[in-house]
């Protein structure tokens, strides 16, 4: 009865799978249907059918994780909620931050170096390479292991023409020692490669600090520019409102026309529009600075005013000096040099495989055993055990594996050398362009200062002439717009000098000079 129920159940499963097969077109489902039909028609034993049923119960697990059904629809699975819940296991770290405090650039850089997750990732990577160096050095020492063997077995043995049962038990604790005595530089090559990898990781760590410092510095100056633009827009709005009130007063006294007032009102509305744009740009710049420090974008940061910061007046040194500094101290270039050293060490490590290896192994311990046969009483026995051997291994043929391994290592070394040359060219070009941009920003700052002074005098003269009735309001509005543009250009020019000097320090690697040395693990 039970087998009949199972068969009926399997028939139902087969019908369901046939429906699924017709809708999904899976060859694997069709194979399962055929197998079920074969078993059900043959009326196999209950044990076989039950085994098949257990196997069928695991089929949903096989199809639980699948690919997207089509290319035009996103993939979705209930299992992705498990990944989403795992995010909660990694809470955001808490940082030291004082709301309401006006931060200098140096203070923000210090906070970013301690709080930016990218620096922690680079640090952990350097620590991992330091541990890898320790693993490589450990190969110079012997390996000692404690081993305890306990076993028992029973078998038949032939005694006096008959088979007798024999039982044996064994307990054997030992100390095993293995030591590679000499390998013609194989281990030293691995250690040299690990040291070069550690240098590479440390230089990458320093380069990450260089990038973080520049990200914070660039975002800081963008925020300074946004704050300055907001202040300039407020000043322009105040000027426009003054002109609007003057036009309305002159209209009341019959000295102005309605179009003059409308023109002044339009200028005020335009100034207010520009102010709102400046406020939005400041919010975005504030979010960029907070993000570069590892904080939430909504964190409100108070920074110094552009008027409180000393603007450089000239560049120190020539462009060639800047290029030379970049080629000497850029950590990413030093990282490429470390790759060449690692490739050299890998070549030496592979060459050692052409020579024999001499190793020593030995063990010593005690042995306690018990034995019994059906014809004789059981007995215990014990004694010390030891084994010592020298092993000389020399690979004579391996299908040219060593030749290919050395060729691969040499190719990697050649590629690393080419990487140095390519990066050297990019550094020289980047430094040269950054130096030229810095020089241009200095000249633009002087021109913007002269433009602001001229626009301010022009606006003052136009307003005075308008009050005297010798100029119309359109001339005043035009002078007002020119003054607003000059204010914006002056702020942009001053912050551009700071930004371009920072970019030059980033390209040459000078940003790391004033920072505390970051010597990785």
Predicted regions and their residues:
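Periplasmic alpha-helical coiled-coil/stalk elements that build and connect Gram-negative outer-membrane
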Residues: 203-325, 434-437, 441-444, 482-484, ...
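A short glycine-centered flexible hinge/capping loop motif at secondary-structure junctions
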Residues: 251-255, 466-470, 507, 511
